[in-house]
């Protein structure tokens, strides 16, 4: 029997609420959420805190004891740009450790407008259900049997037909139903409703599928919750926000490049420096990167009738999302990111943007991580299963994954590490697998950008594609300190705002103190805090995550890539650096020799003599 509980109206109340949903009993309970109990934690920080409190780290990640958590950011519901991101977390069935994955879209803002800070699902439903929250904030678990077997595009359409266009949806596709270890939770994009914003990493779609939870549907609030501020606080917050807007719009990347090209603009940078993955992270320079670089990407996007400069979430001034049509003008996919262009493109020797976006659409529709699927296909090509550059074979392999007679589908749904295992790579002397802690690399060669590699080795979530915000060398830090600083910056970012906007703010001398003070206003502090307190927020999150992992059996002794010393990153030099990756286990980089001191030029008087 499905249960509906009635709750108080949350709009205009000072404290938000937590929904605790027991799927085994079909019970929904509400608790008050007081931000003062959680410091500056939002999003990822709340995930770490609640998993620490409610999850046994040794539990089966696909069992009833693994909570699935939806949490909003610290600034969600305010005027701060890009602050309406959604964090989803659980123990990862892919890595076996703690996992937070975040997404744009409208789900987090709709949660906030309903006065909901966090939703925690526990247990497992016997029957397929979905959560619906109506305009008055009343939640209900409803029968989802009619949606089982649907991919994310059709279920989004069906739900909008039932509830109207103003809903926010987070749903799994058939990859999540099949408990694929790289399955994603796909969220609706702001304005368009397209399910192209994915909390894609770590297999959280499988956790959702294991609970027989097909979707979370949130209607637009009839009386939206207002973040409590006095008139004086609101005026100060608004004035400080002008500095944030100036930093983001004045930054060449977030203010000019990304609105036109999206994050795919990264291809130009990594292509030129030799960090763009090519043929399964071979380490070679990518010879044809311009074919998927910003100029050609933009030309194809516009010539085919696509769109750019789209905000993926309410209040975003970066507007880096896009819609791509094929060469015949038919809608193909949306929200195409740098990681997808690189890993489903140059990494496979594919330089056809239509083919790349077809792979993106298939992954979004099935509900899968394009990073892990792209790297898995790269390993398959490297091992001779198909040829590099064979776009048709790659597309067909993904398209038929869930057919009953698919050879590779049951393996590919579990990601790059599973494919490598099946191909016998662990028996090879050099193991060409771009994976850390069972999670695939993001689209940066760590031999060229070592900061990313250090973060991926040491990070609690493995090769997290949002780690590496401080990707360059920082003097006087050990590799462990470099990695931890980078990860702490990332953890704070995942609590506050989008990574791109955060990067513009974090390195701006006027915006940094402004966002600190904005955090203080929400905390009710008469002044401050300073940036050291904000950085400590990120470190506190890391401590919780590392502690969880240690109890789950994941320790720093395992801080190496797939195969340990046999991984090709440690063996094969990159063309750009002429050196392999130096592991965090190897200690700091050698101190470069000091250049010789040039002789002191003679004085003019001595020259005359």
Q: Language-model segments: what does each one mean?
A:
Residues 7, 11, 160-170, 174-609:
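Extended C-terminal regions of large enzymes
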